[in-house]
């Protein structure tokens, strides 16, 4: 069974009197920085000078420094910039300025797990990974709640790395909801596998193929959109709130029977075998290698795929349907 920590298992004491540098002030960086400050901790921000994020952080009362200057004065460094930007920033603006005994925190294990960032031996390397977007991290904190998170230790130079990870988790409100101990490998691999075979890749293609089948059979695209995409939220909300069995108890008997008899014939053992093939690509590092090479080429393949997604018929119909539902196009 997984080890789960709550508020009673964590303390802010390891962070008291220390300077925390949050590198990045995007959706996660801003939320975590604000929560940590509201928890009574000293937080500074490290950014490229002059950008919109710099001005926003200053306007919200933070001391803001260029990344290297923030790292040089920090005891705890939270690397909250996008994964693919991290290796270059690490090499040029973080690693040369780290203090011995510093604590380096990541919100995702990708660069550490796949060896794109190699920290020196004289620092702690930890991960605190909220399992929600930054907006929810902040909103739940302000409401007196929190979002769940994962914590992991990659390198324990101080002997207290887990305590630092739990302190950060407590400071951002995650221990209010529950924090699961994991490893960098497990977090990275399950995150990527889940995105590819279910949450982004699998779900997206399932919806698109269902839409295509209905339209090819002569049904109106607008009706098809509602049936396979719009109503997906209703089902996912039930699953999120009640679990899969609870969702089944929340739909009609006709939906139950149809879903339970037809679903396994579509998502069958052959699909499961394909899922495993692509999961193993993640585990072996093959996907990471492919993605790093793609990013180095300027993301040309990704741009083409995004354009194809943008122009799919479900998006053309969806733009009009979202205006009807929400009064404007939702990005």
UniProtKB/Swiss-Prot annotation:
Binding site for NADP(+): 25-28, 48, 53, 83-86, 134
Cofactor requirement: Mg(2+)
BP-aspect Gene Ontology terms: isoleucine biosynthetic process; L-valine biosynthetic process
Pathway in which the depicted protein is active: Amino-acid biosynthesis; L-isoleucine biosynthesis; L-isoleucine from 2-oxobutanoate: step 2/4; Amino-acid biosynthesis; L-valine biosynthesis; L-valine from pyruvate: step 2/4
Entry EC no(s): 1.1.1.86
Chain sites annotated for binding substrate: 252
GO molecular function ontology, one term from the record: ketol-acid reductoisomerase activity
Catalytic activity: (2R)-2,3-dihydroxy-3-methylbutanoate + NADP(+) = (2S)-2-acetolactate + NADPH + H(+); (2R,3R)-2,3-dihydroxy-3-methylpentanoate + NADP(+) = (S)-2-ethyl-2-hydroxy-3-oxobutanoate + NADPH + H(+)
Signal peptide segment: none
Domain KARI N-terminal Rossmann per the UniProt entry, residue ranges: 2-182
InterPro entries xrefs: 6-PGluconate_DH-like_C_sf, KARI, KARI_C, KARI_N, KARI_prok, NAD(P)-bd_dom_sf
Active site as annotated: 108
Positions with a binding annotation for Mg(2+) 1: 191, 195
Keywords annotated in UniProt: Amino-acid biosynthesis, Branched-chain amino acid biosynthesis, Magnesium, Metal-binding, NADP, Oxidoreductase
Co-factor binding comment: Binds 2 magnesium ions per subunit.
Domain KARI C-terminal knotted stretches: 183-328
Function: Involved in the biosynthesis of branched-chain amino acids (BCAA). Catalyzes an alkyl-migration followed by a ketol-acid reduction of (S)-2-acetolactate (S2AL) to yield (R)-2,3-dihydroxy-isovalerate. In the isomerase reaction, S2AL is rearranged via a Mg-dependent methyl migration to produce 3-hydroxy-3-methyl-2-ketobutyrate (HMKB). In the reductase reaction, this 2-ketoacid undergoes a metal-dependent reduction by NADPH to yield (R)-2,3-dihydroxy-isovalerate.
Family note: Belongs to the ketol-acid reductoisomerase family.
Protein name as it appears in the record: Ketol-acid reductoisomerase (NADP(+))
